[in-house]
Regions:
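Boundary at the C-terminal end of the N-terminal hydrophobic targeting segment
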Residues: 13, 19-24
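Loop/turn elements at helix/coil->beta-strand transitions in domains of secreted/extracellular proteins
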Residues: 133-134, 181-188, 233-240, 312-318, ...
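Extracytoplasmic soluble-region selector
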Residues: 25-127
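Positively charged n-region of N-terminal signal peptides that target proteins for export
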Residues: 1-4
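A mature extracytoplasmic/lumenal domain signature
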Residues: 39, 110-112, 193-195, 322-324
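Bacterial N-terminal signal peptides
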Residues: 6-16
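Aromatic- and glycine-enriched glycan-recognition loops and surfaces
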Residues: 152-261, 348-356
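Active-site-proximal substrate-binding groove within the catalytic cores of carbohydrate-active enzymes
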Residues: 116, 138-169, 245, 259-578
């Protein structure tokens, strides 16, 4: 596993409650105290976990324990990790209230018998509308007009026909097939190139939908896009948009207004700075976030997009690509605006504006996911508590739990470190062949499937190259094989997978990359009463019945799989979930 550098910051904000000392009870000697909090993760924008409750347990010399009244305990909190060192929680007695996203450490202090006993624990505030640790996040490339520059000629994106790679109507078919292959797992798909001109065109404007993508029966391309978002829901898929807040092009309808408001990057002499080029004849420029925000233009284009496509709000998510605060090597986006006399806009000033952008979207019901963190921002800035998911994972997984910062892929050339898990992108597979999706099912089973399962448990410790999770789950190499187990229940043995599909009622997905014959798999504990199972082959067109009432003997299933085959396993007679 390649770990990415992350600096943990400590906040100064503290809250406390007065300690009331008490005497010993029943002659027992207090030896230590343990602080507990329930729930451990606060999700103020999801479900019921909006506040937490603290309890301090006293452990006595005779081995007994009891809960110590909160009125006798002093509680204090401090931020452990959060973007901008913000206060993460506030306390009122033994109750914990979320303030901002991040991780806080809560300490309890008890005075007894002339001694002070202390204990601490961490609490996580994930202020997101969606749980990205339990969602497959993908991108679907739709279109890009123009002739690519030489360095991009061989990219699959620019093969013949890239002006319209996938129409809105074709996109629904991709979504349907993907839902079949993934057995209905919750999904988010961000559309790339949905705007006029396709990918990397028209920015900073988001006001016109690509007319080339329109369905014949619709009056406008906007109607078709809104139709796709609504239809995608039928296949367990939230359709949203891939947007960009830093790039700009001269053909944009907003070009003159942004120039007039001094919102584009300039070189040291004050001339507009070309930030790059993707398509011949169309130079790319960059937006200066603080200037755009100050002029109210960022807020205006965000509001306009939400108003134009109201269906987006139900999905509660948007993806901002290339959300950078500096160029490679820490170079400023705009050398001209870096000068004190022109605003002194350092990368830190860009980050301050980016935080405002995150909050502005959130206040309107949206999470903002991104391409990455840390790679084009000041050292240590990972938008912890602001960005719920990174397309390319860049947090320290032992410090940032998946519910606070979830991953797309972790490695460009492989499936990533199996011990921590990795999800998938899908985009590169669809670019090659969106109709047949070769390799999609295998990658899903090797990456997202076990990652989703592991996301239900807490990473406890990484020791001797073994990762220990809560609930007894362990991921490590055993006798040269990559193993994920929970006791004697094996979920993974190299590229043979046997993993509960926890998003469905009772289902296991088995997959093998090399294939095998007559391999014995122990069923999980909650299947102990199952005496026979039905097998279904997973295909693009749905699940195909394979075998009925396969016997389970002594809690074990004997299974044979062909190379790259995946099957769905259900208790015999159980109804198969999902759509065709």
């Amino acid at each position: 596993m390649r770990f990415f550098l992350m600096f943990v910051v400590n906040a100064l904000a503290l809250t406390s409650v007065f300690v009331h000392p008490v005497g010993a009870s029943d002659g027992k000697k207090l030896e230590r105290v343990v602080l507990e909090i329930r729930p451990r993760v606060l999700t103020p924008n999801q479900g019921d976990n909006k506040t937490g409750r603290l309890s301090l347990m006293g452990i006595y010399s005779d081995g007994s324990s009891n809960k110590i009244p909160s009125t006798q305990v002093g509680f204090s909190s401090k931020t452990k990790t959060a973007s901008g060192n913000v206060q993460v929680v506030s306390l009122k007695g033994d109750k914990v209230f979320p303030v901002e996203g991040g991780i806080a450490t809560i300490e309890a202090s008890l005075a007894r018998d002339g001694k002070t006993f202390t204990a601490s624990t961490d609490i996580i505030v994930a202020p997101y509308y969606r749980d990205y640790s339990q969602t497959l996040v993908l991108k679907l490339f739709l279109a890009m007009e123009g002739e690519p520059v030489e360095r991009l000629v061989n990219d699959p994106t620019f093969r013949k026909g890239h002006e319209v790679f996938c129409s809105f109507e074709e996109a629904l078919e991709v979504i349907r097939k993907t839902d079949n292959l993934t057995r209905g797992i919750p999904k988010i798909i961000y559309l790339v190139g949905w705007q006029k001109g396709g990918h990397d065109h028209g920015y900073p404007a988001w006001s016109e939908v690509n007319p080339r993508l329109k369905r014949k029966q619709d009056a406008t391309a906007l109607d078709s896009l809104r139709w796709l978002i609504r239809e995608g829901r039928k296949f367990n898929t939230t359709v949203s948009l891939h947007i960009n807040m830093v790039d700009a092009y001269q053909l944009s309808p907003l070009w003159d207004e942004y120039v007039a408001n001094d919102c584009f990057a300039k070189d040291e002499s004050g001339k507009l700075l070309v930030g790059g080029i993707q398509v011949k004849g169309e130079d790319m420029y960059n937006v200066v976030y603080p200037k755009e925000w100050e002029a109210g233009l960022a807020q205006r284009r965000i509001n306009a997009l939400i108003k134009m496509i109201p269906e987006l709000k139900e999905g509660h998510t948007i993806h901002i690509d290339v959300f950078i605060a500096n160029r490679d090597g820490g170079k400023p986006v705009s050398p001209w605006h870096l000068k004190p006399e022109n605003g002194g806009l350092t990368p830190d000033k860009y980050v301050e504006t980016q935080r405002k952008v995150f909050h502005y979207w959130r206040d309107r019901g949206f999470d903002v996911t991104g391409e990455g963190t840390g790679w084009a921002h000041p050292p240590g800035e990972h938008f912890i508590g602001l960005q719920p998911m990174s397309w390319w994972y860049s947090w320290n997984p032992m410090e940032i739990p998946e519910c606070l910062g979830a991953r797309g892929r972790t490695d460009r050339g492989s499936d990533g470190d199996f011990r921590f898990g990795s999800s998938m992108h899908g985009e590169e597979i669809w670019k090659q062949d969106k109709d047949n999706m070769p390799g999609f099912l295998g990658m899903f089973c090797r990456t997202t499937l076990p990652w989703y399962y592991l996301g239900r448990s807490q990473r406890v410790k990484f020791e001797n190259d073994a990762l220990f999770y809560s609930d007894g789950v362990v991921a490590r190499n055993e006798s040269g094989k990559r193993i994920i187990r929970k006791g004697d229940f094996i979920l993974r043995e190299d590229d043979d997978l046997f993993v509960p599909a926890l998003w469905n009622k009772k289902e296991i997905i088995a997959y093998s990359k090399p294939g095998y014959a007559d391999k014995s798999w122990k069923l999980p504990d909650d299947w102990r009463k199952v005496k026979a199972v039905d097998l279904y082959r997973i295909t693009l067109e749905g699940c195909v019945p394979l075998k009925k009432r396969v016997p389970v003997s002594d809690g074990k299933l004997l299974l044979s799989l062909a190379k790259e085959e995946a099957v769905s396993i259900l208790p015999a007679g159980a109804k198969l979930s999902g759509k065709k």
